[in-house]
UniProtKB/Swiss-Prot annotation:
One of its GO terms (biological process) is cellular detoxification of fluoride. Belongs to the fluoride channel Fluc/FEX (TC 1.A.43) family. The chain crosses the membrane at residues 4-24, 35-55, 71-91, 103-123. This is Fluoride-specific ion channel FluC. The lineage of its organism: Bacteria, Pseudomonadati, Pseudomonadota, Gammaproteobacteria, Enterobacterales. Its main location: membrane. It is found in: Cell inner membrane. It holds the Pfam family CRCB. It catalyses: fluoride(in) = fluoride(out). Na(+) binds at G75, T78. GO terms for cellular component: plasma membrane. It comes from the Bacteria. Keywords: Cell inner membrane, Cell membrane, Ion channel, Ion transport, Membrane, Metal-binding, Sodium, Transmembrane, Transmembrane helix, Transport.
């Protein structure tokens, strides 16, 4: 149990630092769409799709690695709370179109990235 807790801790911290770096680098590039948050959510969605595909095929992977990558790293990297706050800020500024676009791109993009990764890595591990 301690190993699993440490895996979540290390993965979560690493994912959170990665999200912060993405936000620092990419959020200033666009006034309405926080590109760093979007990148974090899309990358995290892709990684978790890839992980689930691999983990469903390779049953001998240590659960510590599964938890480190999915709950830890992807949990720290992706952020629904920051995304929600950024949408609320756009709404408060009266930027309703940008808020809606932000919701659309984050949600559909994340679903698409997870499905794409799952499909790609399920196909690659099937051979």
């Amino acid at each position: 149990m301690l190993q699993l807790l440490l895996a979540v801790f290390i993965g979560g911290g690493t994912g959170s630092v990665a999200r912060w770096l993405l936000s620092m680098r990419f959020n200033p590039l666009h006034q309405a769409i926080p590109l760093g948050t979007l990148a974090a959510n899309l990358i995290g969605a892709f990684i978790i799709g890839m992980g689930f595909a691999w983990f469903s095929r390779m049953t001998n992977i240590d659960p510590v690695w599964k938890v480190l990558i999915t709950t830890g790293f992807c949990g720290g990297l992706t952020t629904f709370s920051t995304f929600s706050a950024e949408v609320v800020f756009l709404l408060q500024e009266g930027r309703f179109g940008w808020a809606l676009l932000n919701v659309f791109v984050n949600l559909l993009g994340s679903f698409a990235m997870t499905a794409l990764a799952f499909w790609l890595f399920s196909a690659s591990t099937a051979h």
